[in-house]
Curated annotation (Swiss-Prot):
Annotated protein name in UniProt: Nucleoside triphosphate pyrophosphatase
Active site per UniProt: 70 (proton acceptor)
Lineage: Bacteria, Bacillati, Cyanobacteriota, Cyanophyceae, Synechococcales
Species assigned in the record: Synechocystis sp. (strain ATCC 27184 / PCC 6803 / Kazusa)
Top-level taxon in the UniProt lineage: Bacteria
Function: Nucleoside triphosphate pyrophosphatase. May have a dual role in cell division arrest and in preventing the incorporation of modified nucleotides into cellular nucleic acids.
Length: 195
């Protein structure tokens, strides 16, 4: 029997993705202070954050498989997480519109039964629509972008503001299902173990 699958995230979108893929996770929020970490580049930062979140939660379980994730958006050399306020979200959208961003999601999967941790980062290019200020104001006013890395939710209203994606769509939502499958297989698990 496989270990309990634990999602070290408060993200409803990540939980929903797992459930749609047939995995019913136990949710254990890490409450890790993301501002306590810094890194030289976006990939290193999302992996460090994912690993820290997974590690914080994994320490509470003796025999679980713990997944931590973190996403950041890189546009024109600037890295963005969740916007701190509506004003920041509006300014960010005014910068992002008509641009192509790179959405990075770090994944850390800790197997407490094997004392192993695997990390991998997904990259998806996001082509933002050249939306007008009224649309930006309305979108930010909906509240949706305030809880999302990059100030948009692909699976919500924000999906209407994206022209196209190059890469994995679930990565943009916060958890690349292909990466998760690969990490599980590298640890010796089959997908059917969790269905």
């Amino acid at each position: 029997m496989p270990p309990t699958f634990v999602l070290a995230s408060a993200s409803p979108a990540r939980k929903r993705l797992l459930e749609m893929a047939g995995i019913s996770p136990l949710v254990a929020v890490s409450h890790f202070d993301e501002s306590s970490l810094a890194a030289d580049n976006t990939v290193a930062l999302v992996e460090a954050l994912a690993k820290a979140k997974a590690g914080t939660v994994a320490s509470k379980f003796a025999d679980a498989l713990v997944l931590g994730c973190d996403s950041l958006l890189l546009v024109n050399g600037q890295t963005y997480g969740k916007p701190e306020s509506p004003a920041v979200a509006i300014a960010r959208w005014q910068t992002m519109r008509g641009q192509v961003g790179e959405l990075y999601t770090g994944h850390a999967l800790i197997d407490r039964t094997q004392n192993r941790c695997l990390c991998q980062t997904g990259l998806t290019k996001v082509h933002f629509a050249d939306v007008d200020d009224d649309t930006i104001q309305a979108y930010v006013g909906s509240g949706e972008p305030l809880q999302c890395a990059g100030a948009f939710a692909l699976e919500g209203k924000g999906g209407m503001l994206i022209n196209k994606l190059d890469g994995c769509s679930s990565n943009v939502i916060g958890l690349s299902l292909p990466i998760l499958r690969s990490l599980l297989q590298r640890l010796g698990y089959s997908l059917k173990d969790f269905w």
